[in-house]
Amino acid sequence: MDILRKVAEIHGTPTYVYFEETLRKRSRLVKEVFEGVNLLPTFAVKANNNPVLLKILREEGFGMDVVTKGELLAAKLAGVPSHTVVWNGNGKSRDQMEHFLREDVRIVNVDSFEEMEIWRELNPEGVEYFIRVNPEVDAKTHPHISTGLKKHKFGIPLEDLDSFMERFRSMNIRGLHVHIGSQITRVEPFVEAFSKVVRASERYGFEEINIGGGWGINYSGEELDLSSYREKVVPDLKRFKRVIVEIGRYIVAPSGYLLLRVVLVKRRHNKAFVVVDGGMNVLIRPALYSAYHRIFVLGKQGKEMRADVVGPLCESGDVIAYDRELPEVEPGDIIAVENAGAYGYTMSNNYNSTTRPAEVLVRENGRISLIRRRETEMDIFKDVVM
């Protein structure tokens, strides 16, 4: 793609590149699935926290699902109204609660009995509580991002809901919240989880529900079938006066590419390594989840060589892609990593005292905008007290 080469020439590498057109199209697809539903769509800021991208999603009618004060600040910088912010997470401290209340956030997903006790002590006005329940449903995804089983740290078991409601019946509980995991590509886990939670909602007369997210994308083959999701899930949601959904990866991952420059090609015996200028410091997903990302070399085609694409860091796990067929690669070539818009920059790090990458947006009119400058080495140490 010529535009990616142009970005690399202007802004260097490693660089994340996002396409506004794709971002808007994917956000609209989400809303189309829920046609006829009283929907509050929210974007999961953990997937990508750049306020420029969040502003685009705000323009598309999205609120924000946030976990931390930092994610809330990102939403505020994007101009997202407080009444469309949902506070999620399993480790809310009293100090954080007081901060979010000062920022006028009023929709809260409560994760535990213990958390609700703190809310009861604070007794804030106007807070709408959604209780995260654990439906004991296997999402059939990577264990690190599966969240719907009793062994996981999230939510309260459905069988404990009666005692929860009895204990906190004086609180302004508006509905239930369920989120069984991430990168789910089959409809069946959603159907199983939602059927349990919808029945529980009816038992308590709840007219609102938060169904979480978890929609999987096509990294290497299968993507969630939205037509099947619409057919099997959405009809039961139309009875609710408000349905909250939190979608991150599905919207932003296909909108982004990671550009890396080949430093050298290392050959030994029958093994080849293409060494690039960013590894698990800029994209940790392959190292952390054994995640697969399609890659291609700008301006080259063919399958002349088979190699691991590896980063420059001091770990054998510092790998972008294993055993890929590539054209004959040379130092200076640019490799593009697909579906890199989610959990890329937000999980980047300074390991080996490397700098975080730049972020660039390609506007709908084709204009290239720098939306986050590349870190410098001095940025890494600016908070050190000597």
Swiss-Prot record:
Keywords for this protein: Amino-acid biosynthesis, Decarboxylase, Lyase, Lysine biosynthesis, Pyridoxal phosphate
Residues binding substrate: 249, 285, 289, 315, 343
PROSITE patterns: ODR_DC_2_1
Binding residues for pyridoxal 5'-phosphate: 214, 246-249, 343
Alphabetized InterPro entries for the sequence: Ala_racemase/Decarboxylase_C, DAP_deCOOHase_LysA, De-COase2_C, De-COase2_N, De-COase2_pyr-phos_BS, Orn/DAP/Arg_de-COase, PLP-binding_barrel
Biological source species: Thermotoga maritima (strain ATCC 43589 / DSM 3109 / JCM 10099 / NBRC 100826 / MSB8)
CDD domains per UniProt: PLPDE_III_DapDC
Gene: lysA
Record protein name field: Diaminopimelate decarboxylase
Keyword Ubl conjugation (UniProt): no
Quaternary assembly: Homodimer.
